[in-house]
Amino acid sequence: MSPVSVISLPSDLCLPTSFIDRSGRELIPLHITIPNVAMRRQGKLMTRASMSMNLRTAVSDDAVIRRRGDFHSNLWDDDLIQSLSSPYGEPSYRERAERLIGEVKNSFNSMSNEDGESITPLDDLIQRLWMVDSVERLGIDRHFKKEIKSALDHVYRYWSEKGIGCGRESVVTDLNSTALGLRTLRLHGYDVSADVLNHFKNQSGQFACTLKQTEDQIRTVLNLYRASLIAFPGEKVMDEAESFSAKYLKEALQKIPVSSFSREIGDVLEYGWHTYLPRLEARNYIDVFGQDTENSKSYMKTEKLLELAKLEFNIFHALQKRELEYLVRWWKGSGSPQMTFCRHRHVEYYTLASCIAFEPQHSGFRLGFAKACHIITVLDDMYDTFGTLDELELFTSAIKRWDPSATECLPEYMKGVYMIVYNTVNEMSQEADKAQGRDTLNYCRQAWEEYIDAYMQEAKWIASGEVPTFEEYYENGKVSSGHRVSALQPILTTDIPFPEHVLKEVDIPSQLNDLASAILRLRGDTRCYQADRARGEEASCISCYMKDNPGTTEEDALNHLNAMISDVIKGLNWELLKPNSSVPISAKKHAFDISRAFHCGYKYRDGYSVANIETKSLVKRTVIDPVTL
């Protein structure tokens, strides 16, 4: 068990701000003393903190002994945010980018002409795929939606059950073109079967590759690996492709010299697809794109693509600065700095949002996601650690009243928590109402109520020491994971219409929402269970599985959960990309990418509690630092 110390709470724990209800009455603070959950647990101390954090108990001003996670402080103070500067908001940079966009569009269009530069029937397919893949990996594809569709329609026209060659008149198919085509077409919703890869196996059932690992051969296997990550449920050949290509590439990295190409391979192996957030991929690919020998001999000069990618990255960086300044003002104005019992990761959450949605018009999505996740974190730390069971029951009831007068029955520190939830959910609903043209508050309130009910159930398990069945814990945990409430209001603020039939395919009762919530619960528990258990929090996916299956070990449980995660990811891929869906990919993409963002945060550890290692690096690389032109 971690060391426990008893300390006095800081005097500013309770928010000094007076809150006013709708009638204009000032709410009078109510100081109450309530027995603490930890007392009932006979000294068992619990938190959902990272393994590197201790748990402290503290005696508050109202004489209640409280548990507090020993979280590190906010890493991004106001002075740092204010010190960020960027000249890329100037019109001249936008004008230069627009000229480059026009030139790249011309390059796309030239591929549609028989007399286009360097275009022949023997390489027209791979050229189109290379162009689409390049603009997507560089993070500039939003400018070329029409051109991308035209290019992929052309490729799909010549797709066969045996794949494609480099060009429409190629005599034989080849693995590189087919793998890149499978990946790219599938990501855009085209109906392409993974069985096409079986045609590239030898008689022994192995993928046919020469023993000599040339750069062209390695790149072919790299594209095979990238394709294998876009797998659907039940596709055995994709599992085989992933296993083969990952092993091949790891061996190749031991032999080839360090170069931009080896770095590209390393990045893809490190992040895969589900945790390789688009803006991070763009930042990394910018570094290798201009130096890659494949690109230097490619079908058009890379300078324009690279310059445009750098300009777009830095122009968005200037917008990020303004949005961060607004977010910090909101965070301070909400009274959040006085909530000393919880983690403050608003900048980190903003980073995740800006890594998956960097269209300028989606400021509401980015800021809404950061706000929603900040609220989720405050509630998480209050329900798991700081609040007593009686207090939490009062808070849960107050949320369902949805009126500032409900705070009269709450302890002082909860008044501030209640008001930030109340005000922020109302504000986000107003933004969503404007975007969707209808009232959204009641629908979104219901989502928040269900979320808090799930937290309340977990608080009861903590108080009693009960370890429920895996199924009971898992179903409740999918709700308490917070995926739904983190995604719902932000996606409704976008310019994408969400009529009722579409919303049902993204929010409940959709498989997309269920699977995204499942990944967050499963991956979160596999990263946090040891620390939770050391602090007395008994219930987790691991402990519940072991209870249901006597004789199993932690390793058995982890293997089972990791297998579940792999299956869930494939199910998520299908829900996003299934062909002939009545709901376009664009309507599902933000919710899907939120799942990727959370998954990224749990890639190495609990990156939300311990945000000063990999998460800090992500913030610096994608938000704080521009690229050099």
From Swiss-Prot:
One cellular-component annotation, GO: chloroplast
Segment annotated as transit peptide: 1-48
Enzyme class (EC, first level): lyase
Residue sites binding Mg(2+) 2 per the record: 380, 384
Catalysis performed (reactions): (2E)-geranyl diphosphate = (1S,5S)-alpha-pinene + diphosphate
InterPro entries named among the record's database cross-references: Isoprenoid_synthase_dom_sf, Terpene_cyclase-like_1_C, Terpene_cyclase_plant_C1, Terpene_synth_N, Terpene_synth_N_sf, Terpene_synthase-like, Terpene_synthase_metal-bd, Terpenoid_cyclase/PrenylTrfase
EC number: 4.2.3.119
Cofactor field: Mg(2+); Mn(2+); K(+)
GO-annotated molecular function: magnesium ion binding; metal ion binding; pinene synthase activity; potassium ion binding
BP-aspect Gene Ontology terms: alpha-pinene biosynthetic process; diterpenoid biosynthetic process; geranyl diphosphate metabolic process
Pathway: Terpene metabolism; oleoresin biosynthesis
pH-dependence of activity, as noted: Optimum pH is 7.0.
Main location: plastid
Binding annotation for Mg(2+) 3: 532
Motif (DDXXD motif): 380-384
Cofactor info, note text: Binds 3 Mg(2+) or Mn(2+) ions per subunit.
Residues the record lists as binding K(+): 540
Origin superkingdom: Eukaryota
Localization per Swiss-Prot or TrEMBL: Plastid, Chloroplast
Domain notes: The Asp-Asp-Xaa-Xaa-Asp/Glu (DDXXD/E) motif is important for the catalytic activity, presumably through binding to Mg(2+).
Similarity section: Belongs to the terpene synthase family. Tpsd subfamily.
Role according to the record: Involved in defensive oleoresin formation in conifers in response to insect attack or other injury. Involved in monoterpene (C10) olefins biosynthesis. Produces mainly (-)-alpha-pinene (79%) and lesser amounts of (-)-beta-pinene (4.2%), nearly racemic mixtures of camphene (2.8% (+)/2.2% (-)) and limonene (2.4% (+)/3.7% (-)), as well as small amounts of (+)-alpha-pinene (3.3%) and (+)-beta-pinene (2.4%).
Protein name: (-)-alpha-pinene synthase, chloroplastic
